[in-house]
From Swiss-Prot:
HAMAP family associated with the record: NDH1_NuoC
InterPro entries the UniProt entry points to: NADH_DH_suC, NADH_quin_OxRdtase_su_C/D-like, NADH_UbQ_OxRdtase_30kDa_su, NADH_UbQ_OxRdtase_CS
The encoding gene: ndhJ
Annotated source species: Nicotiana tabacum (Common tobacco)
Protein name listed in UniProt: NAD(P)H-quinone oxidoreductase subunit J, chloroplastic
Self-association state and partner proteins as the record states: NDH is composed of at least 16 different subunits, 5 of which are encoded in the nucleus.
Amino acid sequence: MQGRLSAWLVKHGLIHRSLGFDYQGIETLQIKPEDWHSIAVIFYVYGYNYLRSQCAYDVAPGGLLASVYHLTRIEDGVDQPEEVCIKVFASRRNPRIPSVFWVWKSVDFQERESYDMLGISYDNHPRLKRILMPESWIGWPLRKDYIAPNFYEIQDAH
C-alpha cells in the first residue's frame, strides 16, 4: 500500500520502496544508500526538519544491517505532526551509508552509536568514532554474529 509521501516521491521521480505503515499508521519507506543523502535534503526542504530518532539493527545473522530514521514535519499545528520512517539497508561486508549530520545535526551521537554497536560507517560524519565502547574494542556488539569475549577479556578492557 502506497502512502501520501510515497506517491509524492513517485510523482517527482525519486526512487524508493514503500514498506507500508507501522502500527501507529506512520508510513515506512526504504531508500537505497546511494540515494539517501539527496532524498534526506529533499525531505528537509519539504518540511521534515526534525529528526526524532535514528537507530540501527541487524536484520538477520549474515544478512543486511539497517539504519532507521524517524522524521517529523510540523506544519499547521503541534498536535498533528506528520511523521515518516526511513529505512536504509547496507551490506554487512561493507556497511556504508551517507551521514545526514549536515542535514539534521541531532543525528550526531545516534549515528556514532550505530557505528559503535553495529559497525555501520556513516560517510562524511565529522566525528565518527566509538561513543560507548573503548576505542580498542574489537568487533560490533549488537551484530547477531558477534562472539562475546570471556569475562577476563572484558575485565582487562577496563
